[in-house]
């Protein structure tokens, strides 16, 4: 059995839906993270949720090593009303687990070059 760290702040997808907020999701799998791969712990992910109307972050979660230590950037982004561009263009050191927050924002914005873009439905 594997016990992973997990942390969440803000709204979940279900909570946003219940409040009538359409969200855009940015999911960064740690299998594409150089630091997670180097640590041998690439089974996690970072997920950010952005309000479709305003572009502002409304929630985010991290599953993986040190998730509780990494979630503070997401909490600050929510408090500051950050959007995908604010988070994605913030310098994140490489290779770190924390850069997955910036990359998840880039995924939501559609500009991330580290993972394949999500399929259109």
What positions do the PLM features span?
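Flexible, glycine-rich terminal cap/loop adjacent to redox cofactors
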Residues: 5-121
């Amino acid at each position: 059995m594997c016990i992973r760290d997990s942390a969440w702040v803000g709204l979940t997808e279900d909570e946003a839906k219940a409040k009538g907020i359409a969200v855009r999701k940015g999911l960064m799998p740690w299998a594409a993270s150089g630091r997670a791969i180097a640590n041998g712990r690439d089974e996690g992910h970072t997920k950010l949720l952005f309000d479709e109307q305003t572009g502002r972050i409304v929630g985010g979660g991290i599953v993986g090593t040190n998730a509780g230590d990494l979630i503070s950037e997401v909490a600050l982004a929510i408090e500051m009303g950050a959007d995908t561009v604010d988070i994605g263009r913030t310098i994140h050191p490489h290779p770190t687990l924390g850069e997955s927050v910036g990359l998840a924002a880039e995924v939501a914005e559609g500009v991330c070059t580290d993972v394949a873009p999500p399929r259109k439905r």
